[in-house]
Amino acid sequence: MRAIIQRVANASVTVAEQIVGQIETGLLVLLAVSPSDTSDDLQKLADKILNLRIFPDAHDRFDRSLIDCQGQLLVVSQFTLYADTRKGRRPSFTGAAAPALAEPMVDQFIAYCRGQGITTASGQFGAAMQVQLINDGPVTIILDTAEWQHGRG
């Protein structure tokens, strides 16, 4: 799984001119699933995101997690995180899982985060979405569970 996480003051996602998800202080997670991802990958990624200490403490140091600051989560599925641009000018997305696999994994990710007590909003899988956010920092971090299998997590 791949995720781009952004610390936000607020964020929202709109489908067909209707806001389908919005949060205040917290993290926007752009999430993609690969064909080889497992439930274990999903849980490890969610735990990493929820516990990353990327929110400031009283001394303005990164020392608080989303859980610590009772922040919120907005999860938006984005298969384009698996774009392969090595050949030609049109990206290939063969590294992304098919919707039949990806959609339940994204749903499980959201359910897991909610199960950890995190207020979690989401976009609409497969829809054309407009995402608005106010970056806080900015703080943007890329996570890839495939790298963790090789000792880089």
From Swiss-Prot:
Its EC number is 3.1.1.96. GO terms for biological process: D-amino acid catabolic process. A motif (Gly-cisPro motif, important for rejection of L-amino acids) lies at residues 137-138. SUPFAM superfamilies: DTD-like. It is found in: Cytoplasm. GO terms for cellular component: cytoplasm. It catalyses: glycyl-tRNA(Ala) + H2O = tRNA(Ala) + glycine + H(+); a D-aminoacyl-tRNA + H2O = a tRNA + a D-alpha-amino acid + H(+). One of its GO terms (molecular function) is tRNA binding. A Gly-cisPro motif from one monomer fits into the active site of the other monomer to allow specific chiral rejection of L-amino acids. Belongs to the DTD family. An aminoacyl-tRNA editing enzyme that deacylates mischarged D-aminoacyl-tRNAs. Also deacylates mischarged glycyl-tRNA(Ala), protecting cells against glycine mischarging by AlaRS. Acts via tRNA-based rather than protein-based catalysis; rejects L-amino acids rather than detecting D-amino acids in the active site. By recycling D-aminoacyl-tRNA to D-amino acids and free tRNA molecules, this enzyme counteracts the toxicity associated with the formation of D-aminoacyl-tRNA entities in vivo and helps enforce protein L-homochirality. This is D-aminoacyl-tRNA deacylase. The lineage of its organism: Bacteria, Bacillati, Chloroflexota, Chloroflexia, Herpetosiphonales.
